[in-house]
Amino acid sequence: MRAGGALFVGRTNTPEFGLGGHTYNPVYGATRNAFDPARSAGGSSGGAGVAVALRMLPVADGSDMMGSLRTPAAFNNVYGLRTSIGCVPHGPTEEVFFQQFSVAGPMARNIPDLAMLLSVQAGFDARLPLTHRHAEGGDFLKQPLARDFRGMRIGWLGDLGGHLPTEPGVLETCTQALRHFEAVGCTVDAVLPPFDLEQMWRAWIDLRSFAVAGANAGLYRDAATRGLLKPEAVWEIERGLQLSAMQVYDAARTRSAWYQVLRGLFARYDFLLMPAAQVFPFDVALDWPHEVGGRAMDTYHRWMQAVVPATMAGLPALAAPAGFGAGGLPAGLQIIGPAQADMAVLQLGHAYDQASGHARVRSPLLG
């Protein structure tokens, strides 16, 4: 990014270890939403989302494991792209083969700016052998964003047949946004993946806990630092340390089976859509939503389950502004593409942006 001419003006706030979809920590406190300071900015790139939405920055970079780019984008009415596995070098870390959940990506108020930042992020890095040589950054500027989408088929996943609880108004706001895809020539059909979605969730939390424990077990094992860890970090690490090798392998098999199911859907559909967040921005004083749509959340991150399908399959997913609920709070929509179709996702996002105009709604804090 520096080689591409980026000017870094500062660091933005994140939660401890990037865990959780609400940006707060004991050092800087909570980051407040760009459209309502009494509400959460999302997380973990909550500071970045607010900075972009409030015109402090044209673009910001971040990473996304469980919606860390997508949730703040949805909460602050901007765009955030979770890139395909290997598109953008992320790290390096001491383990470069096994962990393929967290990826780096851009955030911006429009798709041309998003593509410009991605053009200097993407490419091969010899320190990370699973990055792509064919994704050299210039490709995202050489190809035009404008594209004819007439005849394209889109699958609308919605709330996955009722599996995902949603706050009243979220699903309705996202459903209303579908007309903008139809306006650019796409056909949109409701579809439900033939998969045990609870099994996918269980596999996800095992693989996530395994990865979190692998990266942070040293802090847990050290008595001097264990007491400083927030409860969610302790929970993740303890779960990860208790997993057997076969449990991790079985979870990886479930992940692979889920990818194949989505690959089958992409034989019928060019893109998939679903909400980027199951709730509107919530009270900034909360640690996380403990109930959504009348259902109790059994983990600190269950309310973010909508971002898991794309992560589990390693697919590109763009969080796009979907409009505003009755209370004036933003909602977000995910545009999910096939493996390595990052450019196609940006092109559809650009067409949607031009048709909808949602991202051009400014925060009332800007006057």
Please identify what each model-predicted range represents.
Residues 2-124, 311-332:
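Short glycine/serine-rich loop segments
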Residues 2, 139-140, 166-193, 216-224, ...:
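Acyltransferase
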Residues 143-158, 206-263, 275-280, 284, ...:
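Short helix-loop capping/hinge segments that flank enzyme active sites or metal/cofactor-binding pockets
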Residues 82-172, 176, 350, 355-367:
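A short helix-breaking turn/cap at a secondary-structure junction
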Residues 131-134, 202, 250, 282-304:
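Short, surface-exposed loop/helix-turn segments at secondary-structure junctions
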Residues 102-109, 237-243, 335-336:
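Short, well-ordered beta-strand elements within core beta-sheets of diverse protein domains
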Residues 263-264, 297-321:
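Small-aliphatic-rich amphipathic alpha-helix that forms the alpha element of a beta-alpha
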Residues 12-20, 195-197, 276-278:
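Short, solvent-exposed turn/loop segments enriched in Gly/Ser/Thr/Pro and often Arg
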